Amino acid sequence: MKKILAISTKRTDAAEAMLAYLEGRMPQVQIDYAVYDDLVISFIDGKMRVSVENTGLDLADYDMVYFKSSVVHDITATYVQYALRNDVKVTDVAKGAYAGGSKLYTYGIIVPAGISVPNSLFAMPGRLVGAYDRYEQALGLPFVLKGIHASRGDVNEVIRSRDDFDRVVAVALTSDKKAYLIGQSFVPNEGDLRILVFGGEVQLVIHRQRADESTHLNNTSQGGRATIVPIEELPAEVIAASRSAATLSEIGIAGVDMVKDKETGKWYCFEVNEGPQMATGSYRQSKWNELAKYFMTELEK
């Protein structure tokens, strides 16, 4: 039997009646109905899954997905891309196109390509209330809740207890800015690398480290210190992952944030920034010099 999943922003009697009629017209076809709140995305140990909670299946188990309506563009696009990669037919392929900064969409592109990110879990705001145990089980303690659209260290909280989780979620449910959160395993580190990749090539590397242990954020916008690191000092795996992440994200002027777990030595990609503080932040002239070289190279092609 073939299986179709219909997804909409909210469940309605009219939609259920339509889907029941369609199912009756198509022998050997099962149509399941879900809303976006029913979907949970996980990136665990290098594997991406999209769980359809109300059916018990993975999105990849379906033969076709009918996106009756869309939620926030990058979230819908993440589901579309996942379906297509798993040979699931999609009624609206155009919904898979997205250009903009989104941690969730970026992870959906780079994780299947073998680039490591910290274990992560994403659910719509409607599923967050009372979900602490699930996040703790999947990610361990402490973990981080961060906004998928946030930048410069904004909307980024360490969760050490149920009270922390409930507090951050309460804010998420009352603020558009913090409405869409991804949970992520905490990575102990001694700073991170902002790797500027222009045209698929690493051009400049800046090490950023938090000012003190009162915060977990290394961003210079949050008071972190910055130091230029010679490119030749980077491990080959970090250079390769940075180039690949920028290329897969189709961002010509990218800031790839890489971090090393100081306990395990493993490298992770935090995100790929489409606006990597070129006009502001640390070492502006160094960034501008590299940007000028890149522009000239492109113009001469």
Residue ranges of predicted features:
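ATP-binding N-terminal substructure of ATP-dependent carboxylate-amine bond-forming enzymes
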Residues: 1-90
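Active-site nucleotide/adenylate-binding loops and adjacent lid/helix of ATP-dependent enzymes
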Residues: 2-8, 14, 20, 24, ...
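Short glycine-rich anion-binding loops that position phosphate/pyrophosphate groups of nucleotides
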Residues: 70-72, 148-150, 275
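Protein kinase-like catalytic core scaffold
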Residues: 143, 203-204, 266-271
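Phosphate-binding site of ATP-dependent enzymes
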Residues: 154-240, 245
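A short glycine-rich, hydrophobically flanked beta-strand micro-motif that places a catalytic Asp/Glu
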Residues: 184, 194, 251-262
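C-terminal active-site "lid" helix and adjoining low-complexity regulatory extension at the edge
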Residues: 230-233, 247-251, 260-301
